[in-house]
Amino acid sequence: MTESVPSQPHQPKPQGRPETDDAPDDRAPALLLSGARLGDGRVVDVRLSGGRIEAVGTAGSLAAPDATGGTRVDLAGYLLLPAPAEPHAHLDSALTADCPGPPSEAQQDVQRRVTEAALLQLGHGATALRTHVRVGDLRGLTALEAVLESRRALRGLVELTAVAMPRVLTGMAGAEGLAVLRDAVKTGAGVVGGYPDLDPDPTGYVEAVLGVAAEFGCAVDLHTEGGDPARLARLAAMAGGLRPGVTIGPCTGLAALPREAAERAAARLAAAGISVACLPQGGCGALAGSASSGYAPGVARLLRAAGVRVTAGGGALRDAANPVGRGDPLEAAFLLASYGECGAQAAYEAVSGRAREVLGLPEVRVEAGFPAELLAVRGQRIDAVLSLGYSRIVIHRGRVVSRTSAVREYADCATTAALDLPRQSRSGGTPA
């Protein structure tokens, strides 16, 4: 294999208000990733510079970084992948499952939770996160301001986007909610959303959100169980063709519909270009306690078959809706594959490439010219790393921003000695 020549990858033209500042960092020092295995089985060297992939060549073919501060990272035994992204988080309520009473909504406490949860998800591999934030009522914009402070503090480590979620947008209380939503966008929310199912007039709620999105050029991300075919049809008719795009989820209610009705609803969503964020780990703070707040196996498969862009998120992260939520995109992919929604490769694509599309971020491939947003996981194949990929190296904007190392050792045993089994997991074999 010869060294690849940098090219200009196709990138979608930015439309409307940008969610994040995801431009490559021209100041990032050169970095050589040596001996990494790619998804197609090749073992390669990858040189990064200026926040992008500069070159990809056969292992040992690329020169080490020069003396200007560049470094070399040995990735022998690691699978190198485009980094995941988190399309559906609730960081403002994360890590509150063990609170003895209602979690504090003081800005400093929310900021601490958001920052800790974002770093936790970064450690799992997600270099971009979209978090839903409640605005209005008594809390005003406090939680949003905390998220925006965390975004500034985490700049250079992970990209963080806020979705503003007002409670009510119709009726007597709707005027205040609409004003708060506009203020949220002006303050820094990159996406508008909410949960129309909980409004007295769900259709009116959607109309209000779409109006604000059109006014400010924002993307839309709405919570819905998706159990009402007529309501989904109206949403598809209203939102179809909106740029920069509409995402809904988790849509678990589709599983309760007759098969033909669910297929028709999925076809309408596909025709309208609406994406769906599933939550295979279950639990979502916005819909906590509802009849279909868990995960419904088969929904993602049905949507994919209809041509809907399906991504998968973590949802609740150790809060009241899911006290054991992990926020790990590899676990989300593992569950998609385990439920039979798709194969391992497509499952990983749902939390990486499809997730980046939903977030409006540039495509990532392990090829010259693409953004250096990468995840190295110890293992040889995608199915193995989804099952046992604990050791991870995360690269954002061309530099290593997180490392997690796991070593598994076994005590002496006559059987393992007789079979010549390792006491410690092999670096190039069984993942750790």
Describe the role of every protein-language-model region.
Residues 62-81:
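Active-site metal-binding motif and surrounding structural segment of the metallo-beta-lactamase
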Residues 166-172, 186-295:
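Active-site core of metal-dependent hydrolases
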Residues 78-80, 84-86, 95-132, 137-155, ...:
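Alpha-helical scaffold segments that flank or form the walls of functional sites
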Residues 1-49, 54, 65, 122, ...:
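Active-site microenvironment of metallo-dependent hydrolases
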Residues 240-244, 297-377:
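His/Asp/Glu-enriched, well-ordered alpha-helical/loop segment
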Residues 83-94, 219-226:
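Histidine-centered catalytic micro-motifs
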Residues 36, 51, 77, 88, ...:
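Divalent metal-coordination and catalytic microenvironments
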Residues 100-112, 163-175, 195-197:
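Active-site mouth loops of central-metabolism enzymes
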